[in-house]
């Protein structure tokens, strides 16, 4: 079977999970990760010297290093999360009304989603309900394919309606990905479902390592969509 046929088969067996990145939200005018960090540096009045350091990190696609500079300047993790939630909420209120892939995803009935975005666009366009990964502890893994879980979304890195849930700093990434519960729950998802990554560039070296660790620890087939260009 070719890749399209495999994905169609996964969908028919209710084992296909689109994993959505920021690339799907940027066309609507939402800020990129780089823009969020730059705006945060301005908002918290980070010194010009440290801003220069942040820009160098961003030019190297080292986003967590750039975030570290802001936090070391005296901004708390919680302050940064609250600003990000506020900034993203305002950006959504002023976002562009354009054709987008969220509308396409909403057309599929038997599907679950994961996302690393904070913006909750999947909730908006697909009328998806938030489902936290840790909730899998209380259920059998095959139950997640039941119709009761159609159109639920797992926000891996938090969501703007819950600023305290947002994963942005290096410390918060490590706390999430290195916990035994996350590894166990994500492993079950990764080995029982097929992921289709959408809107990812994988430019950030730290994120590359995280996904390489997550996806290649055991053999499993997953897919990623890239722009033709």
Region locations from a protein language model:
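Conserved catalytic-core helix/loop/strand module for nucleotide-ribose chemistry
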Residues: 1-229
């Amino acid at each position: 079977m070719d890749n399209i046929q495999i994905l169609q088969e996964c969908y028919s067996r209710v084992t296909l999970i689109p994993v959505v990145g920021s690339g799907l939200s940027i066309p609507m005018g939402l800020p990129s990760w780089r823009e969020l960090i730059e705006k945060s540096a301005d908002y918290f009045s980070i010194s010009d010297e440290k801003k220069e350091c942040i820009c160098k990190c961003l030019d190297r696609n080292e986003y967590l290093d750039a975030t570290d500079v802001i936090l070391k300047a005296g901004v708390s993790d919680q302050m940064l999360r609250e600003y990000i939630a506020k900034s993203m909420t305002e950006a959504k209120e002023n976002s562009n009304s354009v054709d987008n892939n969220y509308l396409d995803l909403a057309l599929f009935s038997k599907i679950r989603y994961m996302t690393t975005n904070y913006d909750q666009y999947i909730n908006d366009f697909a009328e998806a309900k938030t489902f936290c990964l840790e909730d899998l502890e209380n259920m059998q893994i095959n139950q997640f394919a039941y119709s009761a879980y159609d159109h639920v979304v797992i926000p891996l890195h938090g969501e703007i309606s819950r600023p305290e849930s947002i994963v942005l700093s290096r410390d918060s990434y490590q706390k999430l990905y290195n916990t035994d519960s996350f590894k166990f729950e994500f492993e079950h998802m990764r080995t029982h479902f097929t992921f289709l990554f959408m809107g990812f560039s994988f430019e950030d070296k730290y994120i590359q390592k995280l996904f390489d660790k997550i996806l290649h620890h055991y053999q499993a087939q997953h897919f990623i969509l890239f722009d033709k260009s």
